[in-house]
Amino acid sequence: MESAKVLFLDRDGTINRDIGRYVSSREEFILIDRADEAIAIAREAGFRIVLITNQAGIARGIVTPQDVEDVNDYLNELLAERQTSFDRCYYCPAHPNYPHPEYDRFIDHRKPSPRMVEQAIADLREEGFEVDRSASFFIGDKLIDVECGQRAGLKTILVRTGHNEESLCEQHQIFPDHVADDLYQAVTGYILGQPTSRD
């Protein structure tokens, strides 16, 4: 079994701009500056890359599973331009306030539950990779991302893009290992310890 370090990433507000509603099409998907570069750098440094995202707009009838998958496919197309991609993508379609007969069985996968992370770890194990949690990270813009990562035994980074819930984390006494301005700084400045100059 090969040891693997993994970068688990939230999507909206971390990789792409939070537009104030569910992203339902490629046209609404706008990369945050240098997010794709950050993912490529992490891949070059030996990280497996896994997407973990809540998409409750599905249960609410605002977006469809196909919409979410199309947007994720588009993201992978953008990453392919940098010769990188996600190893796996997971999303939770459920929401406790919007019961849906098709999606309610996934409610316990919703972040901050670590179920999607644990599923990814199990799937990678089936492929011959044993995830080293002590060398793996969860990066997101919300309190639930930090909590999810911590519950899965990962190091956590909160980014100030998107919702920027730094003060909310403090209120709930849930502290990430690091706070970064954006995904690029999180990867290069903290995980890899490289200079973060944008020149």
Swiss-Prot record:
It is an enzyme of class 3 (hydrolase). CDD domains: HAD_HisB-N. One of its GO terms (biological process) is carbohydrate metabolic process. It catalyses: D-glycero-D-manno-heptose 1,7-bisphosphate + H2O = D-glycero-D-manno-heptose 1-phosphate + phosphate. Its EC number is 3.1.3.-. It comes from the Bacteria. Keywords: Carbohydrate metabolism, Cytoplasm, Hydrolase, Magnesium, Metal-binding, Zinc. The record marks T53, K111 as: Stabilizes the phosphoryl group. One of its GO terms (molecular function) is D-glycero-beta-D-manno-heptose 1,7-bisphosphate 7-phosphatase activity. Substrate binds at residues 10-12, 18-22, 53-56, 110-111, 142. The active site is at D10, D12. The keyword Zinc applies. InterPro entries: HAD-like_sf (IPR036412), HAD-SF_hydro_IIIA (IPR006549), HAD_sf (IPR023214), Heptose_bisP_phosphatase (IPR004446), Histidinol-phos (IPR006543). Coiled coil: none annotated. Its cofactor is Mg(2+); Zn(2+). The record marks R110 as: Contributes to substrate recognition. Mg(2+) binds at D10, D12, D141, K142. Its main location: cytoplasm. It is found in: Cytoplasm. GO terms for cellular component: cytoplasm. Pfam families: Hydrolase_like. Belongs to the GmhB family. Monomer. This is D-glycero-D-manno-heptose-1,7-bisphosphate 7-phosphatase. The gene is gmhB.
